[in-house]
Amino acid sequence: MSDIILDSKSFQSAVSKISREISDNNKNIREVAIIGIQNKGVFLAKRILAEIAKLAGIGRSLIPFGTLDITLYRDDLDDLGSKIPVIKDTVIPFDTSRKNIILIDDVLYTGRTVRAALDVLMDFGRPKSIQLAVLIDRGFRELPIEAKYIGIRYQSEELIKVECKETDGVDRVTFIK
């Protein structure tokens, strides 16, 4: 059984809210680069990139875009036992130095995914800044990590499922009981 936290309309509203806030807080859009954390963060990042480019009145290709996989940087690899994690692509085809990196993921919970993402990102250089954007902030942090841009706050230790049109055919966030 599941309860809907965000339907398609409120999902898009949350993405638009994040996009506007990023645009408002980064007046020099030429210094911004967008990086999505695999998997769902990449799809959200592409949407946010499109909205930011539209707000700035420029083409999407003028804002650097990358994808980041944290698999090899996870702090729980030993706990996975014989389960072999699937490694996705990390593609950052631009110099991260002197860029305000907008790091995007679907859910912020313990902070461990973001910690791993920061480790990966620092291997690519020293950005001017790193700003975290998430669709859902669940609270219950285990590490001192906070998002600057949040679609919605939904404090819960229960499982949350994020579905995106690109992979699931629908935009929706549900609380799984």
UniProtKB/Swiss-Prot annotation:
GO BP annotations listed: regulation of DNA-templated transcription
Presence of the UniProt keyword GTP-binding in the record: no
Disulfide bonds: none
GO molecular function, one term: uracil phosphoribosyltransferase activity
Entry-linked InterPro entries: PRibTrfase_dom (IPR000836), PRTase-like (IPR029057), PyrR (IPR023050), PyrR_bifunctional (IPR050137)
The enzyme's E.C. designation: 2.4.2.9
Superkingdom classification of source: Bacteria
Keywords, sorted A to Z: Glycosyltransferase, Transcription, Transcription regulation, Transferase
Reactions that this protein is recorded to catalyse: UMP + diphosphate = 5-phospho-alpha-D-ribose 1-diphosphate + uracil
Motif (PRPP-binding): 101-113
Physiological role: Regulates the transcription of the pyrimidine nucleotide (pyr) operon in response to exogenous pyrimidines. Also displays a weak uracil phosphoribosyltransferase activity which is not physiologically significant.
Family: Belongs to the purine/pyrimidine phosphoribosyltransferase family. PyrR subfamily.
Entry-linked HAMAP family: PyrR
Protein name per UniProt: Bifunctional protein PyrR
Native organism: Endomicrobium trichonymphae
Chain's gene name: pyrR
